A protein has these predicted regions:
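An acidic, Gly/Ser/Thr/Pro-rich helix-cap/linker signature
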Residues: 1-48, 59
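Catalytic glycan-binding domains that act on GlcNAc-containing polysaccharides
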Residues: 30-180
């Protein structure tokens, strides 16, 4: 119990720090949101299984990580938050699959959002494009969630939902340190 409380405290501190970094992308301004509540990630734990990708999708994630030179742990964290590894997940906005890729984004990349393998590759390539554009993992994750136009216009995460999203991906990514 004590170990779990310590882990939750650490996750809360990391989430708040990550959210503050995303909110205050420019150091001359105070963060838009000084503090957000951490959302415990009960479905991912710090255990010996450092890379909890379902076996049937592991090859797609490894290939996408190699293709984009993104950390496998980061792609795993995005998939956990986006779909909890449910390949048929569809958002209210129309995003599909493991990495919740919009069909228009997949089409721009000449890939399918519906097939798990190409969905993971499309999501990874899109995240890499955002990372190259914004130069920051936190801003790239915010743009992945809220759209690059909203992040560019705001100079950071445009709303508390996006701050929470970035914090959740970051806390899972940290828990998955060593995932390979």
């Amino acid at each position: 119990m004590r170990r779990r409380l310590t882990a939750l405290f650490f996750v809360a501190a990391v989430s708040a720090a990550g959210a503050a970094a995303v909110a205050g992308a420019r150091s001359d301004k105070a963060p838009a949101v000084a503090r957000i509540p951490a959302i415990p990630v009960a479905h991912v734990s710090a255990r010996t299984d450092r890379c909890p990708i379902p076996a049937r999708f592991r090859g797609a994630f490894v290939a996408a990580a190699n293709d984009t030179n993104l950390p496998l742990a980061l792609l795993t964290a995005v998939a956990q938050v986006e779909s909890r590894f449910e390949p048929t997940a569809t958002s209210s906005a129309g995003a599909h699959g493991l990495l919740q890729v919009m069909p228009t984004t997949a089409a721009e990349l000449n890939l399918s959002a519906d097939d798990p393998k190409t969905n993971v590759l499309a999501g990874a390539r899109y995240l890499k494009r955002l990372l190259d554009r914004f130069g920051s993992t936190d801003l790239a994750l915010a743009a992945y969630n809220a759209g690059p136009t909203a992040v560019a216009k705001r100079g950071g995460a445009p709303n508390s939902e996006t701050l929470t999203y970035v914090g959740n991906v970051n806390e899972i990514w940290r828990l998955l340190h060593g995932c390979s």
